[in-house]
């Protein structure tokens, strides 16, 4: 144990599958501890092939599988608590990568309604993002690892981190993914569908309505700032007036707080791209 701590390794005591059979929440806690501590997860049994893009911060030279079906017996409240703690971790991207690599993102949990339990999905909508290519003129990561880098770039505020986790969730889907005239992948308009999906996901996970509304607003507008770096101040002012009149905010203080979060989302998103270092590329993308 002491040697593992010195080497920043996280592993279960004894047989990993047995520990997860005893308490399925340990699977989520493993991801959360990786996200909080930045340790590398290893287990003695069941090592699989590498996962992720080589030579990126999120690459896993070995992957592992969790007994994901066991998570179906966990309450939503316990799972959501672990997700929130993971997202607020200093190394959240690394913990999320473990969650994806082990199949846990596609897990299920249960909610109680009118005296009976039913199963619900956790985050299967994220699965298709792993390995999903992007236009390399603008992007240095695939969609999933871009998402992880954007999360890690951001302030540790829950609404901001959920917004960044879900900001590109619609990329690659039919009707969104196309090829441009150079034959490169393009996901024009993905922000609108990502916002729709974010509302479905967060409502399913039973986050409070004001929180859901804020995250959805951030996702739906995360592409708005980039063109304004070229079009200028007048366009920005027209947009601000439109948002003020749109009924999304109860007062100017709430609107100011929302725009501060949106700036953080924009900067974190752009910081995880090539375009973030090039204003012309940013406006074009």
How would you describe each model-predicted region?
Residues 13, 17, 39-42, 91-95, ...:
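Residue-level signal for secondary-structure boundary elements
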Residues 101-104, 113-118, 168, 214-222, ...:
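A glycine-rich phosphate-binding loop feature that marks nucleotide/adenosyl-phosphate handling sites
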Residues 125-133, 276-285:
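Conserved alpha/beta core segments of nucleic-acid transaction machinery
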Residues 2, 132, 137-139, 151-152, ...:
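Histidine/acidic-rich helix-loop-helix segments that form or flank divalent-metal centers
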Residues 182-184, 237-240, 284-285:
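Short, low-complexity, polar/charged sequence segments that are solvent-exposed and flexible
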Residues 1-157, 161-165, 169-189, 193-209:
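Glycine- and charge-enriched loop/helix tracts that form the active or gating conduit
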Residues 49-51, 55, 235, 249, ...:
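Polar low-complexity intrinsically disordered regions enriched in Ser/Thr and small residues
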């Amino acid at each position: 144990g002491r040697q593992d701590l010195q080497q920043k390794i996280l592993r279960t005591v004894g047989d990993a599958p047995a520990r997860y059979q005893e308490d399925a929440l340990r699977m989520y806690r493993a991801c959360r501890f990786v996200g909080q501590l930045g340790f590398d997860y290893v287990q003695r049994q069941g090592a699989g092939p590498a996962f992720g893009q080589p030579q990126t911060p999120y690459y896993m030279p070995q992957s592992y599988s969790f007994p994901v079906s066991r998570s179906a017996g966990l309450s939503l409240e316990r799972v959501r608590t672990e997700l929130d703690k993971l997202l607020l971790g200093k190394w959240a991207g690394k913990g999320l990568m473990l969650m994806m690599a082990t199949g846990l993102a596609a897990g299920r949990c249960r909610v109680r309604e009118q005296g009976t339990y039913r199963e619900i999905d956790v985050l299967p909508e994220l699965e298709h993002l792993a390995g999903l290519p992007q236009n390399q003129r603008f992007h240095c990561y695939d969609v999933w690892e871009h998402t992880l880098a954007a999360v890690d770039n951001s302030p540790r505020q829950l609404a901001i981190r959920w917004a960044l986790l879900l900001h590109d969730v619609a990329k690659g889907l039919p009707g969104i993914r196309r090829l441009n005239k150079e034959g490169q992948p393009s996901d024009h308009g993905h922000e609108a569908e990502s916002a729709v999906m974010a509302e479905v996901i967060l409502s399913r996970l039973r986050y409070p309505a004001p929180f859901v509304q804020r995250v959805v607003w951030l996702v739906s507008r995360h592409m708005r700032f980039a063109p304004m770096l070229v079009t200028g101040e007048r366009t920005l002012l027209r947009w601000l007036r439109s948002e003020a009149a749109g009924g999304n905010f109860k007062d100017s203080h709430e609107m100011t707080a929302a725009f501060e979060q949106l700036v953080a989302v924009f900067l974190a998103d752009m910081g995880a791209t090539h375009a973030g270092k090039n204003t012309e590329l940013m406006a074009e993308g």
